[in-house]
C-alpha cells in the first residue's frame, strides 16, 4: 500500500473528456487518486474556463468538497498559442491577460500551483530577443502571482530552452521569488542527455510537484509505461532519499481512448509497483 503521505494524482486529459467536474472527480476517487490536475490549453474550450462565472467556479469548489478529491494544480499551456514573448503587442497583451485570469481563477477555486510551459515560442523561431522577452514575461507574471499567493512552477520540457532542472534553476535564481518554483517531468528530463539523478537532487528545495510519464529520445507523449527510457525506480528512490515529500502526477492523454479508465488503472498499477520497489510504502 502506498504511503498516505504520498499524494498521487491524475492528469485531466487521462480521464474521459467533458465539462462535468463532479463526474470527473468521482471517477478519480473511484480509481484511487487523491487529486486531479486541470488543463488550460490553447483550445477555445479549455481557455474559456478562465471566463467561468461565479456559479461555475462554485460548482467546481462544491465538487471538490463533495468528493474529497482536490484540484490543487493547473497545467497552463495556452501560451503556446499566445506567447508572452510575441513581437505582436496585441498577442503579448493577450498572453499576459491569460496569465492574470489563470492566477485569479486559481485564487478563486483553491488551485495552489500553476505549471508553466518552458517555451519562449512554440510556433515561431526562437532567438535572443524571444529569450529576453521570456524573462521579462516571467518576471511580470511572478509579480502577479506573488500578490495572489499562487505558485508558478516551471515544467521541464520537450524543448531545449527548459530541458533540465539546471536550466530551470537559472530562472529561479534570476527571479529570486518564493512564488516561482519547479515542476519537473521525469519523462522529459530522461529523454535528454541529462544526469537525471543529479538533476533531481539539484532541484530539491524548489520542486513542488512531479509529473510521471515514460518517454523515448525525441518522443515525449503517449509512450506506454515500461516501453521508454525512464528509470522510474531510481528516480523515485532519489526523490525519496533527497527528502521530497510532495505530490506525484501521472500524466497521460487517454481521454479519447476506447476505455480511458481501464488505461488509467493499468498505468496506475504499473507506477505504484515501481514506487513500492523504491520503498515508498506504508510501514506495516
UniProtKB/Swiss-Prot annotation:
GO molecular function, one term: intramolecular oxidoreductase activity, interconverting aldoses and ketoses
Catalytically driven reaction(s): L-ribulose 5-phosphate = L-xylulose 5-phosphate
NCBIfam families named among the record's database cross-references: hxl6Piso_put (TIGR00542), PRK13209.1 (NF009688), PRK13210.1 (NF009689)
Signals that turn on the gene: Induced by L-ascorbate. Repressed by UlaR.
Protein name (Swiss-Prot/TrEMBL): L-ribulose-5-phosphate 3-epimerase UlaE
Gene3D superfamilies: Divalent-metal-dependent TIM barrel enzymes
UniProt pathway: Cofactor degradation; L-ascorbate degradation; D-xylulose 5-phosphate from L-ascorbate: step 3/4
S-S bridge residues: none
Top-level EC class as recorded in UniProt: isomerase
Native organism taxonomy: Bacteria, Pseudomonadati, Pseudomonadota, Gammaproteobacteria, Enterobacterales
Physiological role: Catalyzes the isomerization of L-xylulose-5-phosphate to L-ribulose-5-phosphate. Is involved in the anaerobic L-ascorbate utilization.
Organism: Shigella flexneri serotype 5b (strain 8401)
Amino acid at each position: 500500500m502506498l504511503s498516505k503521505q504520498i499524494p498521487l494524482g491524475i492528469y485531466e486529459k487521462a480521464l474521459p473528456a467533458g465539462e462535468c467536474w463532479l463526474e470527473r472527480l468521482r471517477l478519480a476517487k473511484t480509481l484511487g487518486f487523491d487529486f486531479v490536475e486541470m488543463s488550460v490549453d490553447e483550445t477555445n474550450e479549455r481557455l474559456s474556463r478562465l471566463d467561468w462565472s461565479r456559479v461555475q467556479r462554485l460548482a467546481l469548489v462544491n465538487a471538490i468538497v463533495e468528493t474529497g478529491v482536490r484540484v490543487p494544480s493547473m497545467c497552463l499551456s495556452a501560451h503556446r498559442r499566445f506567447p508572452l514573448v510575441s513581437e505582436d503587442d496585441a498577442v503579448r497583451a493577450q498572453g499576459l491577460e491569460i496569465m492574470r485570469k489563470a492566477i485569479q481563477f486559481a485564487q478563486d477555486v483553491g488551485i495552489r500551483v500553476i505549471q508553466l510551459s518552458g517555451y519562449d515560442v512554440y510556433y515561431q523561431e526562437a532567438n535572443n530577443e524571444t529569450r529576453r522577452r521570456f524573462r521579462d514575461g516571467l518576471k511580470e507574471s511572478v509579480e502577479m502571482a506573488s500578490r495572489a499567493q499562487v505558485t508558478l512552477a516551471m515544467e521541464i520540457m520537450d524543448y531545449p530552452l527548459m530541458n533540465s532542472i539546471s536550466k530551470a534553476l537559472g530562472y529561479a535564481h534570476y527571479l529570486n521569488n518564493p512564488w516561482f518554483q519547479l515542476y519537473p517531468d521525469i519523462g522529459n528530463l530522461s529523454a535528454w542527455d541529462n544526469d537525471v539523478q543529479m538533476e533531481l537532487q539539484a532541484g530539491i528545495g524548489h520542486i513542488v510537484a512531479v509529473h510521471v510519464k515514460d518517454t523515448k529520445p525525441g518522443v515525449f507523449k503517449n509512450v506506454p509505461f515500461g516501453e521508454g527510457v525512464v528509470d522510474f525506480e531510481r528516480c523515485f528512490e532519489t526523490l525519496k532519499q533527497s527528502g521530497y515529500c510532495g505530490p506525484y502526477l501521472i500524466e497521460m492523454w487517454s481521454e479519447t481512448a476506447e476505455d480511458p479508465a481501464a488505461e488509467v488503472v493499468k498505468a496506475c498499477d504499473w507506477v505504484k509497483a515501481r514506487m513500492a520497489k523504491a520503498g515508498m510504502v506504508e510501514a506495516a
